[in-house]
Amino acid sequence: KRRLYERLEYEATHDSLSGLLNRESFVRFRNDLMRGGRNVSCGIVAGDINDLKQLNRDYGQSSGDTTIKEAASVMVSSFAGASIFRLSGDEFIIVSLESAYEEFMERVGKMEWLLDSRTPNGVSLGCTWEEHLADFDRLMRHAEELMLVNKQIYYKDSSQERKHYSPEYLNRLLQDMEEGCYRLCLQPKYNPL
């Protein structure tokens, strides 16, 4: 009976695909934080997977699901101990309480690099940090606004190179090369001048 209750509680608070906390958990977390009036440092990262709908259309739903799971895995490994939520299909929020600014920004930088290398189109991020959390909603809006700016930059720059370049596929190719799946040959060039 206890296991059943625990399973139901988990299913009610977690996203079934990513294993992250869900939107309902975020609402409860936010309300508890606002009620508690905690005077702690707070870093927030808002993330949105780039071109997830296009990925689903071009390669099928399973490709999009794999991308969501990979992004979630990177977030969890990058922000162990933080509260990580999947708010909707391609939107994520990370809330890191009581972390130093330098540590928070270092984690964001490493996570961004990993997300760019492990997902087909990367994830647009916006992050904010406050030493003494005064207004969670304001800090959250700020992170979301910065994410939207980065999303627009992605779409502006994605017309040619980003459309055809994927770090995920490059990493697979390099791995296949290391495993001997390809034979590399040097083609000499001749310049009569």
What are the roles of these predicted feature ranges?
Residues 160-193:
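Active-site core of bacterial EAL-family cyclic-dinucleotide phosphodiesterase domains
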Residues 9-13, 19-43, 50-77, 85-94, ...:
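Conserved long alpha-helical elements within nucleotide-processing catalytic cores of c-di-GMP signaling
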Residues 61, 105-116, 125-156, 170, ...:
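Catalytic-core segments of nucleotide cyclases and related cyclic-nucleotide turnover enzymes
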Residues 1, 48-51:
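Conserved acidic
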Residues 44, 70-133:
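GGDEF/GGEEF active-site signature
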Residues 40, 120-122, 179-185:
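PAS/PAS-like sensory domains
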Residues 49, 99, 130, 189-192:
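Hydrophobic pocket-lining residues within nucleotide cofactor-binding pockets
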Residues 1-11, 23, 163-170:
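Interdomain signal-transducing alpha-helical coiled-coil linkers
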